[in-house]
Amino acid sequence: MFKISFLVLGLMLLMTRNTQAGEKSLYDFLWLDPDKKVYVLQNKLFKKEHTFYADVGYMVNFTSKFQETSGFTGRAGFYVHEEWGVELMINSYNNSNNDEFRNVRIINAQEPFIRRLNSSYAAMAIWSPFYGKINTFNRIFYFDWSFGLGPAKIDAESNLKSVTQGDVVTTFKKESYTGAILKTNVKFHLTENIHLGAEYMNTYYRAPGPRNPKSDRLRTNTDVILSVGFSF
């Protein structure tokens, strides 16, 4: 999952490299005379430098095989530069057993190993190098594409001890980890102050598992988030 996440980010950067055109970028028009040069003006309608923003969002988790997990996220940030900002984030998760969990419990007469996140907190650096617009028949939609990375505090719980001891009915113990969050976000501007967001977020941390309860391994938690926010 760790390699796949960076592969996805790499492909996204490659596909969108043209959206980083500056206001004085040179464009090649083959139908012009060779000695002609054309510059396309890319004026930014929605400036980010020295602006605050706050978002709330709904997230869906794609990590656990045995849990239905969703939740809510809130974040606030400030752009110190047109391309660079800082952000504080809080995520809250709701977990429930799914059909896979119930099937395993019925067939094997034992519950599977589960680790589920309850909440996470992060302080992130935001890099927003890409911007662009989508032309429709009667409206132009402007967007920014950003990336975020920062340390995170993760509150979770698992039934690791019960599973390794072979208990029929498991109990969950609270756990706490320090890790990191890596994400990418596309923000669509509806007005000067209101925007919608779509985000892909990975949470990384090290934790033990049932195969080797005394050894930590890198774990990944993946969320997709839809959000709404305002800036000023």
Residue map of PLM features:
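Repeated loop/turn-to-beta-strand initiation elements of outer-membrane beta-barrel proteins
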Residues: 52, 83-88, 132-133, 188-196
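Gram-negative (and chloroplast) outer-membrane scaffold detector with strong preference
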Residues: 87-161
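Short glycine/proline- and aromatic-enriched beta-strand/turn motifs that initiate or cap beta-hairpins
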Residues: 21-77
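Outer-membrane beta-barrel translocator domains and adjoining extracellular loop/strand segments
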Residues: 68-71, 99-104, 138-139, 158-167, ...
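Extracellular loop and loop/strand-boundary signature of outer-membrane beta-barrel proteins
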Residues: 41-42, 60-61, 107-113, 165-172, ...
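Transmembrane beta-barrel strands of outer-membrane/channel proteins
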Residues: 56-60, 72, 78, 88-92, ...
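Outer-membrane beta-barrel "beta-signal"
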Residues: 23, 121-127, 219-232
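Residues that define the transmembrane beta-barrel architecture of outer-membrane proteins
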Residues: 50-52, 68-72, 117-121, 143, ...
